Amino acid sequence: MRVNVKKLIGKIAENDFTRKAFAEAIGMTEPTLRRKLRGESEFTLGESAKVREVLNLTTAEYLEIMLGANLN
C-alpha cells in the first residue's frame, strides 16, 4: 500500500494520539509503526482497516491516506 505518511501523521495528531498510543490502539508496537511510517514495511490490509476504524476515517480519507489516491 502506498500510504500518504504526512496525512496519516496529521490524522493521528488531530485525534490526539501519541504515536505510541496510536500503535497500541491498532494492535502493534511503536517500533513497528515507526518502520511502517518510514516505508521500511507496509501496512497489511487488516492493519489498514484498523487504522480506518481507530481514526474514524471517511471512505475518501481512507483512500487518500492509506492508498495514496488523489480524489480531487
Protein language model features and the residues they cover:
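DNA-binding alpha-helical recognition surfaces that contact promoter or target DNA
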Residues: 10, 35, 64
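A short, Lys/Arg-rich alpha-helix, primarily the initiator
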Residues: 1-17
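Short C-terminal boundary/hinge segments that cap the last helix of small helical domains
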Residues: 55-72
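Short, basic-rich loop-to-helix N-cap that marks the start of a DNA-contacting helix
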Residues: 40-52
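Short alpha-helical DNA-recognition segment
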Residues: 16-35
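Residues within the helices of the helix-turn-helix
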Residues: 9, 20, 49
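The DNA-recognition helices of helix-turn-helix-type DNA-binding domains
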Residues: 29, 40, 69-70
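Polyanion-binding surface elements
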Residues: 11, 52-54
